Every structure is written in C-alpha cells, then in structure tokens.
Amino acid sequence: MTEIEFKRENEYLSNVRELITDLIVDKNKSISKSTESIYEQKKFLWDNSSDYTDEELVGSMNEVDLNTKITSFDLIQLNKYKQSLNSPYFAKVVFEDKEYNEIMNIYIGICTIEKNHDYYVFDWRAPISSLFYNYEIGSSSYESSNGIIYGETLSKMQFKIIDGKLIRCFNSSLNIDDDFLQEILANSQSDKMKNIVSTIQREQNEVIRNISDPYLIVQGVAGSGKTSVALHRIAYLLYKNKSLNSNNILIFSPNDVFSDYISNVLPELGEENVLTTTFSDFAKVCLKPYKKIEGYTEFLEKIYSSNNFDKKLIEKKMSYEYKNEIDEYLENIENNIKFDHDIEINNHIIEKDEIRNLYLSKYLKFPYSERLDFIAEDICYKAHISLKHKNKVRNVIVKEYNICVNQFELYKDFLIKSNYLGSFISKGKVKYEDIMGLMLIYFKINGYPNFYGIQQVVIDEAQDYTYLQMEIFKNIFPNAKFTILGDVNQTINPFYKYKSLESLKDIFPKSKYIELKKAYRSSSEIIDYTNKILGISNIVAVRKENNYNVDIIELDESNKIYQVNSILNLMNKNNIHKIAIITKNVEEAKILYKNLENDNIQFIQNTDDSIQKDVIIIPSYLSKGLEFEGVIVYNDKETYKEDDINLYYVVCSRAQHMLSIFNEPQKILKK
C-alpha cells in the first residue's frame, strides 16, 4: 500500500469514528428521553388508574411495554456502537457491480454503521459481506433483496486497528497462510475465547452461514475452530432470523469451566449470551426428587483416578442395547399387569375387561401417567364423579392393579431382574452411567418434556455423547434445528466411541455432514507430534513453524519441582504467559499444586471454577476445549494407559506455541 492510500484509509477511519461518536451521543439522548417518558407514563397510570377502564389500562400498559422494548433495542444498539468505536471494521472489499457499472467500497465490521441510508460499515453477517469470506479476486456475487448481484471483486484488504489507530493494512486473498491470519494466530492471548470475524475461513463460513439444512454435523480436528464457528453461527442466525432470540437457543457444554471460557464471544459480537447447560444439569428435570446427579467431569474423574468400577457394566449402560433391554423390561411389566378383578367406584362396578381395554388398547399410545389420567377421566364420567376427584380414582386403579409409576422403583427392579448388581446411587448422587436408563423410564411414564420454545440446539464435544443421548435430544427438542460439533479423535469417554460422527445421520436423517481439517491453534511442530500420537496424517497445520520443538523431559523424582519451575521460566522468557500445567487426574494436580507453593498459579479442580490467572494447574478432562500458549504435560508416574491415548492427544493438542512433556507415556504412542 502506498503512503497516499494509507493516508486515505486513515482519513476514512477518522470519519467513521467521528460518525460513531455522533451516533453514540444521539442514541444516549434518545434512550435518556425514552426512559424518562416511560417513567412518566407508568407514574401517570399508577396515579390515575381509577379513571380508566380495564381495557384502557391494558392498552396503555401495552404501549408502555412497546416503548420499553424499543428502549431495550436502543441499548443493544448503543452497546454495539461503543464496541465498534475503537475498531469499526476489519476488512474492505472493492466490488464492481456489472449491471450498474458501479464500483463499491465495502467495509466490514462487527455491526452496521449507517446514516441517512449511507452505509459506512456493513455487519459481517450481511449478505454483501460474503464477498469477503467466499471469494478471492475475480468474478463474484452476493444475494440482495433484489436477487443475486453479479460482479467482480477488484481487491480485498484487511486492517489492524487498535484503540482507533490504523496500525497496518494487508492486501488479502484470504489464503490460509496469509500474513494477517498468521499475525492474528501468533498473538492470540486471552483467558477467554475471542471472536474470529476477521479471520473466518471459507470452510468455517460454510458452517456459519448454512440455513438450508435443519441438522448440521461437523467433524472438526483439534484447533479447527469448531466452538468459535458454532458461536458465530449463533450470532449469524440471530441476525438472519429476527423472530429468534437468545432464549430460543440452547448450548450443551461439557462443563462450566468451558461455558465460562466461551462466554465473551457472543457479547463481543453484539449479541446476548444464550442458554447453556450440561447433560447432567439438564437431566435433573427428569430425575426429581434426586437433585444431586453425577456430572460428566465427576464421572471421568472416577474413571481416570481408580480401577474401582465395572468396565463392562458401564459399557453396557451406555450402549443402545441397554435401551432395548429397558424397553423389553417395561413391555413385559406392562403385559403382565393382572387386571383380574372388577372394581367398585361410587357404587358403580367397573369391569376388569373394560379397564384392561382402556389401558392396553384405547390409550396404549400414551405414556403410563397420561394413560392413567385418561382412564380415570373415563371412569369419572361413567360413575358420575366430579373431575376434581380424578386423582383419587387414578390412585384406586394404581393400587387395585399394582401398577408402578415410580421410575426409581422400576429401575431398581430392572437392575435386579437383569442381574446388574450395585446401586445407581453413589455418595448420594445418581451415577452418570445410570442417568440415561432412568430418563428412559421417566419418558415411558411421563412422555418426553417437549421444550417447544427451543428452536436451535448446539451440541459441542459431540463425540462424548452416546448415540442414545443424541436420540434423547432429538425427542426432547422436536421443533429445534441442531448444530452438532465434535472430533472422534478427542473422545475421552473410554466406554463409547464413534467410528465417525457421520453415523448420527441415522438419528438426524436430513442432516449435512461437514469436515473441518485445518488446525489453527497449534504450531506445525505441535501438530506433527499430536499426529504421531494417533498415527494420523490428515490434519493440516495452518500456523507456521515457530522454532519451538516439543520438549520431552524425564522427571527427576528428587528435583521435579525445580524442573517444572525451570520450564515455566523458559516459557516466560519466550513471551509465553498463558500456561496450563495439565495432569491426568485431580489427585495428581492437588499434589503438584501443593508442592509448587506459588500464589501466582491457580488450581482448577471444579467444573464451576473460572480461569483467573495466567498459569493454571488443571486435570486433563477439564482442559477439553480450552487452549493455552504453553502447555506442560505433567505425567508423574506414567499414568496414561493404552485406553487413555485419546485423552493424551487432547491434553497435548491444547498447546498453541510451546509443549513440554514430563515422562512421555511411550507405551501408548503409535509406532
């Protein structure tokens, strides 16, 4: 870029920032005025409510509600302007419209900056912005309200703007090794995930902007940006569908540490955070009165910290075969209810054959509980009993024919009759591996709790959910579209593994399967090492070499704390500050944390801990989905076994720039 061009871009930036400042001032005035007006409206209605009819009051309150919503929208817009002020845009496309022979300078940023129908910056989600993400120099097109606009992309440019100052301009064709992308990747330092709008790649954009497929299944390698893509997809859907709001979207997250880690992305994009839950927390809806349920992380801690469990039994409980066994058991229970006598209610004899017919024929398609309600209603009508006594009639039926509608009693009975020894409760909590069995019985009794308000479901780390869990999701959210993201190579559930996530098409038949094969997180040296762990070669490293080889160190038992501190110092000298010391389990992490005696190091041991310090100690299964500039794999006594190879892969693939490994578990590495 010439000096004259740079000066011209600087002037444009100044003009845009000046406009945003004016928009902020105007919006503040508007909000202040409307807030005061709403207060006066409410006060007037309160003071004079006796002068109005109920209809008039409802009409006036509706007007107040409308004004409140408008003000809320203005507050959101104000926040977007404030976020944009210091960096209004990140890219520019020069596009020639062939139909009108018009050359357009299209600046792209987090949100639209417009005044009097003149667009100074376009929202990255706008159709015209696809010119930046989808095309290089040459023929191109975008969708508009008037149809497809054809033309030619003459040039593309990316900007580095910090605190309102234009630092650098990059001529860009958005190749994967372009200078701008490499600079962004090299300097990504944060406690939390950041937005990637300025570096969204074409294969990622395909996922983000897909609105034609109801179900998306994304297989993405470690560091391919799966979670970032999912969050940007949410932001895009909120932009595209104005009837959609944050309460209509639900993310299933592996744990609360991860949920906290991703919590900044949507607000950075000018959107509210959406609903987030874990499978265990969500299951509580179906497992009352048990409020304590073992989380997935607790389950993994139990598995990776001891051998005190029945591997075959857990594998069975997570299999689809287990569902079939439960279905068979329930069908057998149902068919063996003895409708062997008539009952008398309110001086009316209800014949046993009639009740059998109602239960096993007329209302057979309904869940147990609903079936009993319908039967009780029928009997109330026949016996001339008020419907307010329906529950009493229902209780009579349950008692007379010994019909069990308690999911926990049924599950206990199933375990006993199937010779599956042991309780489904441990330390006062429902075991993770028993959640699905209990839920299946709950659904048989009560039906699926349909959450019709949820229109979009995002399932992250999908490889760690069983086929049965996926089927449950599909049934619970019948009206929702799904975005399912995972990586079979990062499966850390030792009892269940997909050969390919594409097999989920059996549950989601109208789905599109997409693979993300490029890794943006780790340096090529680290990618080479992690590829060797699994004996694979299909992962493409986007980061250039950074001249830090993977460091393999043998722990000296008498000097190990000194060794760890030496690596920490070495990383800091190389400008590596966001560091994770990752142990296999929490017990090993506790011992190391105690021995290091360093107040500048944070110990992450619970799922609700949030990362507050630059250096953390964290057990392997909590590190999933996170990334750090440097990673120290602390393996005190070579605790990784052959079955843990995917877990070891996950741990090593958290590193961006530097990876140091104490006591490399050579027994499990692929030859």
Please name every model-derived segment.
Residues K92-V94, K156-Q158, I217, S253, ...:
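A structural signal for short, well-ordered beta-strand segments and their strand-loop junctions
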